[in-house]
Amino acid sequence: IWNLFLGDLFMQKSTTELLNELKNFDSFKEYEKINKNSMINKTLSQYLCDLLEEKHLKKSDVIRKGELNESYAYQMFSGVKSTPSKDKLICLSIGMDLSVDETNSLLKLAGLSPLYPRIKRDSIIIINMNNKKSVVEINEELYNEGEETLN
């Protein structure tokens, strides 16, 4: 089901394919006609709400598990906070039990850089997410490694 959802969001063309196609167009209008179905047409808050529905999650459970401030998190879901920080979205991803790939898709949709394995802090987060660690456990390891915690 999740793959179908991602397929709906990002359609069939890979980002690399789209980047290569962009080289062949003189105007956006031409590109858009051919690739309209590959364009993301959801806001971050719409995407978050769709994730909740798709994964059968409750906002309150996600917020608690993600160790997020309630009012801030509800603002992310409602769209009031349209540009949350990378760390807040990572915490939300952990609360939703998203994979690293799903988290990176969420970060990109928000206009943020994805988790990058060449960066020490990101590597710590990736390893711990892969091992289904909690925000508290990830923060503990980040702190022990001299890195900034998530919250």
Kindly label every feature range from the protein language model:
Residues L52, I63, S93:
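The alpha-helix within a helix-turn-helix
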Residues F25-K59, V136-L150:
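A short, Lys/Arg-rich alpha-helix, primarily the initiator
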Residues D87-E102:
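DNA major-groove recognition helix of helix-turn-helix/homeodomain DNA-binding modules
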Residues E102-K132, G146-E147:
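Short amphipathic recognition helices of helix-turn-helix/homeodomain-type DNA-binding modules
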Residues E67-P84, L109-G111:
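Recognition helix of helix-turn-helix/homeodomain-like DNA-binding domains
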Residues I1-T43:
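N-terminal flexible/basic segments that precede or flank functional cores
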Residues S60, S71, D101:
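Key DNA-contact positions within bacterial/archaeal DNA-binding proteins
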